[in-house]
A protein has these predicted regions:
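Beta-sheet entry/capping signal
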Residues: 256-258, 262-264, 272, 415-416, ...
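Long, compositionally biased intrinsically disordered regions
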Residues: 693, 700-941
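Often metal-dependent polyanion-binding catalytic scaffolds in large enzymes
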Residues: 1-467, 486, 641, 727-730, ...
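Active-site cores of enzymes that catalyze phosphoryl transfer or operate on phosphate-rich substrates
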Residues: 350, 356-363, 427-428, 433-524, ...
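Conserved alpha/beta core surface patches that mediate binding of polyanionic ligands
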Residues: 244-261, 491-493, 523-531, 565-577, ...
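Active-site-proximal structural scaffolding
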Residues: 22, 79, 218, 222, ...
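Catalytic or ion-translocation cores adjacent to nucleophile or general acid/base/metal-coordination motifs
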Residues: 275-307, 533-721
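Carbohydrate-active enzymes and regulators
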Residues: 32, 61, 96-98, 119, ...
Length: 941
């Protein structure tokens, strides 16, 4: 089959090789099962695998009944092992696919199109040059670029770190297996090594035996720095530099260090009582330890490389002056026993001093992790600033005596890392829900005698009071013992921020995110609490300082619609504008994809987010404020997921001003950053998406046709009404959700530290969090939140307008936002399976209501598929992404038995819980099916 998209990084002609390799690893797993567990398990797995493949090819009721009876006849032990077999196969096939993608990119790099693939740095830069972007304009673009992925702990991330280590070793071995120069004996040895890894995969429990702590989640995030990011970050910059040279020539465009990594792990306390101030301190210190270990390792490597002797080179005068000063201050004392040895090797001498200083900082941070307090030695670094200055001095000096090639390798990579990560490794965001701040402020103001009825004040009076208090020289400091425990803990978070800014550096924190922001006063309340901790106030010369940035998070459909009103009240407040100006005049605004989709469905969420971005940028431009949009995207389509490059390019024209920030959920982290090769690719396509979307800074983009917007407005209204008709106005829908999906059991899977519900209440759409809402529907193969309402909306638009079909087709062809929406929807539809969903519906108690709800969902599913195929001009879903289509289709025959097994186990487990006092023997295998189906679908929530 020819590749329909020459700019794609993968050649479909090579799919046969991929299929053969997947088969090879399936056989390796089969051998392992036979050897470790015996013939009976192997035959059981094969019977199910082959049987469901036959059913996919041609439905046969007798065979389907035979397979269902076979599942029903299995005992608990055999069921568990069958589930583990399929799960292990998914893990292996995912690794093989990732290796295939990496090899195809490398092959294209070596032998293919010189512009590489869509989203590569080279292709992107060349395309922008062809559009008319000059070298000077490209420099302007690059200087404003700031790409900030933010790692989060995902409540439904189903993968253990132990397994990820084994998977990484398998990935590396497969890569080696593809080396053309391998001899027969070497290949056989590698296959034995891989088989050993597969055996360890089989012997390792994929289900956590306990719920992870927040510290476990912090370490989970740090894993990716060790495994890939420390190497990927410098490579990202190198690829951009090569692209600039290719397009514009040498030394025409300088690539700044535009990447920053953010994190919520250890800072996100919204709905998670386990994230305390102490946990936040430790999250920062653990990141610092990781960074400092890496820097020490790299400084050691540089000491071995930069062996220049003063017999042959003369360092720069600036370097010599600095080395002399540092020798006088500490070097002669530290190197008393090595003075002669390093006297003629100036770079080694300085690097040895630098290592000692890094070690002093590291040991202090480790001591603080152990017992909370330790004094930093006088010789140790207090921040990364001096360390970076010394590295740049060495770089400049090396280049002064024509050692630019040496300077441009390991030393430059370390400089890039320090510029990107500092000593803190990542910038930690703090997040808390707005009502927590409101209650704390009300309590403090009442105790201080400043306002006894704050919670009853109208919004305008709140803003006036808060503004006046913020501009005061001093505020009454609340007596902590008089406060409730929650208010005292809320204040302690701000104390911790003030403390850790001193310990870890002024840029250790990103922003303070306020979830469920409904009013401008919610932002002002956070600033008032920050003032009490000394994070803002007046300098001795009466000038203002503000060491905190606040990001309001707009999550629900209603909040998105009121975003202009909230921001207008905020930006017109004199006190707020003064504080914003002194903190850099940058306003970050976060947009929530998960709750808005759960609330109003994918169409309303998508369109209201699109409009909100335009409104926010228009407002901030009006008030002369720089704006950075922070996208709270998840891994699934229902939570804003989808290819990062396409998602960024699809933003409204002229709304991305060089900066973008977005969450990388735990489920996505493993897929993107477990392996170096994939991590470089993912960082690259995200960064080039940002570069493309920001091109309007130098080449103003025309907005898309108003007719597109009018059509989308109409479609979104219809889609939201259809979705709400199902989720809000259909009797029994929430009972159906809780009974016809495994959402009740998901909470027992020990997936994350955060509770799955906001509070323990009756079955209600607004009490369950967005992530388990989407996870539950996905497990039961409904995927409702990601597509429901689209079919009705598209069909209705065509009924209302004679030229409706032509208009929608035009939008699909020429409007990236609309095409991205429908392309992502196709993935969700492709992963749904209505026949299997019907079997889940049979789990519900009230079958009359359940069957009516199922038929409603099935009808909308069929309509949505029909309408999307009609508008896109495709014969089948995902024809426009054939490799992805192939990947998902290949998994179906393996997912089918797992879903039927899960249905059986849900029924047995719930019957046991309802009638027996002892622990259910069916729970453990049921939890394994959740893990296995998540691996097969390649996403959770």
């Amino acid at each position: 089959m020819p590749n329909p998209n020459p700019a794609a990084p993968y050649e479909l002609a090579n799919l046969e090789h991929l299929e053969n390799q997947v088969r090879q690893f399936g056989e390796l797993l089969g051998q392992t099962i036979r050897e470790q567990e015996g013939e009976a398990l192997y035959q059981a797995v094969e019977k199910l695998r082959r049987g469901y493949i036959q059913l996919r090819q041609q439905d046969a009721p007798a065979l389907r009944q035979e397979l269902m009876q076979f599942i029903l006849d299995m005992d608990v032990n055999l069921l568990e092992k069958v589930i583990r077999s399929f799960n292990t196969f998914y893990i292996l096939s995912n690794i093989v696919e990732e290796d295939f993608r990496d090899r195809e990119r490398r092959r294209k790099f070596a032998h293919g199109d010189p512009l590489l693939w869509r989203g590569s740095a080279r292709r992107t830069v060349v395309e922008l040059k062809e559009e008319g972007v000059t070298a000077a304009q490209m420099q302007t673009l690059m200087d404003q670029l700031r790409y900030i992925p933010v790692f989060t702990a995902h409540p439904t991330e189903a993968r253990r770190r132990t397994l990820m280590g084994i998977q990484r070793r398998i990935f590396v071995a497969i890569n080696q297996l593809e080396t053309e120069s391998l001899g027969d004996e070497e290949q056989a040895a590698l296959l034995r090594q891989i088989k050993g890894h597969v055996q360890m995969l089989w012997r390792t429990n994929e289900v956590r035996t306990r719920k992870p702590t927040v510290e476990d989640e912090v370490n989970y995030g740090l894993y990716y720095f060790r495994e890939s990011l420390f190497e990927a970050i410098p490579l990202l910059y190198r690829y951009f530099e090569r692209a600039m040279r290719y397009a514009y020539g040498a030394n025409q465009v300088t690539v700044p260090s535009f990447l920053r990594i953010g994190s919520w792990i250890g800072g996100d306390r919204d709905g998670n009582p386990f994230v305390t101030a102490a946990v936040t301190r430790n999250a920062i210190r653990l990141g610092m330890v990781e960074a400092l270990y890496e820097y020490i390792k790299r400084v050691d490597a540089l000491r071995n490389i930069l062996s220049h002797s003063t017999e042959f080179v003369t360092p720069s005068a600036e370097f010599n002056a600095y080395l002399h000063a540092i020798n006088e201050k500490m070097g002669n004392r530290l190197l008393a026993k090595r003075t002669d040895q390093l006297l003629e090797e100036p770079y080694r001498r300085l690097l040895t001093i630098m290592r000692h200083r890094l070690k002093g900082t590291l040991e202090t941070i480790k001591a603080r992790l152990s017992h909370g307090h330790a004094v930093l030695p006088a010789d140790a670094y207090t921040s990364a600033t001096t360390f970076l200055h010394e590295l740049k001095l060495i770089n400049q000096s090396l280049r002064s005596h024509n050692d630019g090639i040496v300077a441009g390798r390991e030393l430059k990579d370390l400089i890039r890392l320090v510029e990107t990560c500092g000593f803190g490794l990542y910038q930690l965001d703090i997040r808390q829900e707005s009502t927590i701040h409101s209650e704390t402020v009300a309590e403090i103001l009442s105790l201080a005698g400043l306002c006894s009825n704050y919670s009853q004040l109208p919004e305008a009076e709140r803003l006036e009071l808060l503004g006046e208090l913020l501009m005061r020289n001093r505020l009454p400091i609340p007596h902590r013992p008089d406060l409730t425990a929650r208010s005292a803990e809320t204040l302690e978070v701000f104390d911790t921020m003030a403390e850790m800014r001193i310990e870890a550096g002024s840029d250790i924190f990103g922003t303070y995110v306020i979830s469920m922001t409904h009013h401008a006063s919610h932002v002002m309340e956070v600033l008032l609490l920050a003032k009490m901790a000394g994070l803002l106030g007046y300098n001795d010369d009466r000038s203002l300082f503000c060491h905190i940035r606040v990001s309001p998070l707009f999550e629900t459909i209603e909040d998105l619609r009121h975003i202009s009103s909230v921001l207008t009240h905020l930006l017109e407040n004199t006190a707020y504008r003064a504080l914003l100006k002194t903190s850099g005049n940058l306003q970050e605004v976060m947009l929530g994809y998960s709750d808005s989709c759960k609330d109003g469905g994918i169409l309303a969420s998508n369109w209201n987010l699109y409009n909100a971005q335009k409104e926010v940028i228009s407002l901030t431009d009006k008030y002369g404020v720089t704006c950075r949009l922070f996208h709270g995207r998840g891994g699934t389509v229902g939570r804003g997921g989808g290819p990062t490059h396409e998602a960024i390019v699809a933003q409204p024209p002229n709304t991305v001003h060089g900066q973008i920030k977005f969450t990388e959920q735990g489920e996505v982290l493993a897929a993107k950053y477990s392996n170096l090769e994939t991590a470089v690719y993912e960082l690259g396509v995200g960064s080039t998406g940002l570069l493309k979307a920001s091109a309007g800074l130098v080449l103003p983009r025309q907005p898309y046709s108003e007719a597109y917007h009018e059509a989308m407005q109409e479609i979104a209204i219809t889609g939201e009404d259809s979705y709400r008709e199902l989720t809000d106005r259909t009797p029994g829908l929430m009972d159906y959700f809780y009974e016809a999906t495994p959402v009740q059991e998901i909470g027992q899977l020990n997936l994350g530290s955060r509770p799955s519900h906001r509070k323990q209440v009756a079955r209600d759409k607004y009490s369950i969090r967005a992530i388990p809402w989407i996870f539950g529907w996905a497990q039961a193969r409904h995927t409702v939140p990601a597509w429901y309402g689209i079919g009705t909306a598209l069909a209705n638009f065509q009924q209302q307008h004679a030229d409706g079909a032509e208009r929608l087709k035009d939008m699909y062809q020429h409007w990236p936002a609309f095409k991205s929406l429908l392309s992502n929807t196709q993935m969700a539809l492709f992963k749904a399976e209505m026949d299997i969903a019907h079997e889940y519906a049979a789990l519900a108690d009230n079958q009359e209501k359940a069957q009516a709800i199922y038929q409603k969902i099935k009808g909308e599913f069929d309509l949505t598929v029909q309408e999307i195929l009609h508008i896109s001009g495709q014969e089948k879903l995902m024809d426009d992404t054939p490799l992805l289509q192939y990947s998902v289709r290949r998994r179906d025959p393996y997912l089918d038995p797992l879903n039927y097994i899960q249905i059986t186990l849900i029924r047995r487990h719930r019957e046991h819980v309802n009638h027996q006092a002892e622990a259910s023997p069916w729970l453990e295998p049921l939890l394994r099916t959740i893990n296995a189906i998540a691996a097969g679908l390649r996403n959770t929530g």
